[in-house]
From Swiss-Prot:
This is RHOMBOID-like protein 1. Belongs to the peptidase S54 family. The lineage of its organism: Eukaryota, Viridiplantae, Streptophyta, Embryophyta, Tracheophyta. It catalyses: Cleaves type-1 transmembrane domains using a catalytic dyad composed of serine and histidine that are contributed by different transmembrane domains. The gene is RBL1. One of its GO terms (cellular component) is Golgi apparatus. It comes from Arabidopsis thaliana.
C-alpha cells in the first residue's frame, strides 16, 4: 500500500549554497591572507617546473673518453719492452711501471709526456700551449683515474641535468684550463696530468650557482654549509706533498667565476608571477634577474678574461712566480713533522755510446739507456729524477 502511494512521487534534493548555510562573515588578518597566498603560490610553483631537465650524456662520454685514453696510454707505454721491471707483468704491454716509479699503477712519465702531459718547459720554449688542455684528459694511474671519474659522475650528472651539456661542457674545459694555467705558473719541475682542476671547477660553480640563484632554493643555508665543508676538505688534501693544489685552486677559482656567468637563472618572483591564476593582479611586475646577478655576471667575466690573459703572458715569458711570492708554495704543500715539501736533490752520471745515452743514478745505482734526440740534453735532470725514484 505505502509503495503504491509513493510510486508517482519524485523527490529532488537541492543542496543550498555554502553562503546560505553560514551567514556569519569570517574576517582574516592581512598577515594570514598573505601567508595563505604565498603557500598557494609555492605549491603551484612546485608543480610548475620552469626549468628543463636535460638528459645527461656528456659527463658519461667524458668518463668513457678518460678511461679509453688511460688504456691507450698503457698500450703505448708497453712496460715489458721498455723496462726491466714491471708490475702485473701478466697483463702484457698493459703492465704497470714499478711502484717506486709510479705508485698510482700507471705508465711512465715519458709516456704521459708523449701523450700530452703538462710540461712547463715544452709550453714555454716550444709554445705548446695545447698541453694546458690535453693534460686534463690524461691520468697517472688506475687509482688516479678511478678517483677522478667517480667524483665526476657524482658531481657532473646533476649539473648536466639542470643546465645542459653546452654550459657544463664549457665550464669543465675552461676550468680545467684555468687549473693547468695556475699550476704551470708555480710548479716548474716535472709533469702534471689529471682532471682535478676541472672537477674543482664544477665544485666552484656549484657554490656560485647557489649564491647567484639564492631566491629559488629552499634549505639554502644547509646546502651552503654542506658545500663549503666538502670544498674545504678537498682543498685541505691539497696541502699534502705530491698533490698539485695549484691546479685545484686554479680550477676552483675559474669555476666559481664561471658559475656566475653560465649558471645564472631567473629569480623566483619572475616565474611565480608567470604562474599566477588568470585575473590575479600582481602588486608589481618582477624582472627576470636581480641587479646583483647582472653585477656578478659582468664582474666575473671581466676577471676571467683579465686573469687568463695575464696568466698566459706571464707563462709564455717564462716567469717563475715562486720568485715573486715567497709564501705561495704553502698553498700547495705545508711541511710538518710527518713529511717534507722540499724535493730531494738527485745526481746522475751520463755517458754517450753511439746514438744512445747511458744514465746512472748515483743514489740507487739504477741505469737506463735512452735514444739520443734533440730534446734529451735539456731533459737530463727530469730523466734523472725519474730514474732515482
Amino acid at each position: 500500500m505505502a509503495r503504491d502511494r509513493r510510486e508517482g512521487l519524485e523527490i529532488k534534493v537541492v543542496n543550498p549554497p555554502a553562503a546560505a548555510t553560514n551567514n556569519v562573515a569570517v574576517e582574516t588578518s592581512p598577515a594570514t591572507a598573505t601567508r595563505r597566498r604565498r603557500q598557494q603560490q609555492r605549491a603551484s610553483f612546485a608543480e610548475f617546473r620552469p626549468f628543463k631537465l636535460w638528459f645527461p650524456w656528456l659527463v658519461p662520454a667524458i668518463v668513457v673518453a678518460n678511461i679509453a685514453l688511460f688504456a691507450i696510454s698503457m698500450f703505448i707505454n708497453n712496460c715489458p719492452k721498455n723496462s726491466a721491471y714491471c708490475l702485473a707483468r701478466f697483463l702484457g704491454r698493459f703492465a704497470f711501471q714499478p711502484m717506486k716509479e709510479n705508485p698510482l699503477l700507471g705508465p711512465s712519465s715519458l709516456t704521459l709526456e708523449k701523450m700530452g702531459a703538462l710540461d712547463v718547459s715544452m709550453v714555454v720554449h716550444k709554445h705548446e700551449v695545447w698541453r694546458l688542455f690535453t693534460c686534463i684528459w690524461l691520468h697517472a694511474g688506475v687509482f688516479h683515474v678511478l678517483a677522478n671519474m667517480l667524483s665526476l659522475i657524482f658531481i657532473g650528472i646533476r649539473l648536466e641535468q639542470e643546465f645542459g651539456f653546452v654550459r657544463i661542457g664549457l665550464l669543465y674545459m675552461i676550468s680545467g684550463f684555468g687549473g693547468s694555467l695556475l699550476s704551470s705558473l708555480f710548479n716548474r719541475a716535472g709533469i702534471s696530468v689529471g682532471a682535478s682542476g676541472a672537477l674543482f671547477g664544477l665544485l666552484g660553480a656549484m657554490l656560485s650557482e647557489l649564491l647567484t640563484n639564492w631566491t629559488i632554493y629552499a634549505n639554502k643555508f644547509a646546502a651552503l654549509l654542506t658545500l663549503i665543508f666538502i670544498i674545504a676538505i678537498n682543498l685541505a688534501v691539497g696541502i699534502l706533498p705530491h698533490v698539485d693544489n695549484f691546479a685545484h685552486l686554479g680550477g676552483f677559482t675559474s669555476g666559481f667565476l664561471l658559475g656566475f656567468v653560465f649558471l645564472i637563472r631567473p629569480q623566483y618572483g619572475y616565474f611565480n608571477q608567470r604562474n599566477n591564476p588568470r585575473g590575479y593582479a600582481a602588486p608589481s611586475a618582477k624582472s627576470k634577474h636581480k641587479p646583483y646577478q647582472y653585477v656578478l655576471w659582468i664582474t666575473s667575466l671581466v676577471l676571467l678574461i683579465a686573469g687568463y690573459t695575464a696568466g698566459l703572458v706571464v707563462l709564455l715569458r717564462g716567469t717563475d712566480l715562486n720568485k715573486h711570492c715567497s709564501w705561495c708554495h704553502y698553498l700547495s704543500c705545508i711541511p710538518t713533522s710527518l713529511w717534507s715539501c722540499k724535493s730531494q736533490n738527485v745526481y746522475c752520471e751520463s755517458s754517450q755510446i753511439g746514438q744512445q745515452m747511458n744514465l746512472t743514478c748515483i743514489t740507487n745505482g739504477k741505469t737506463e739507456m735512452y735514444k739520443l734526440s734533440n730534446d734529451i740534453p735539456s731533459r737530463i735532470q727530469q730523466l734523472c729524477s725519474q730514474l732515482c725514484r
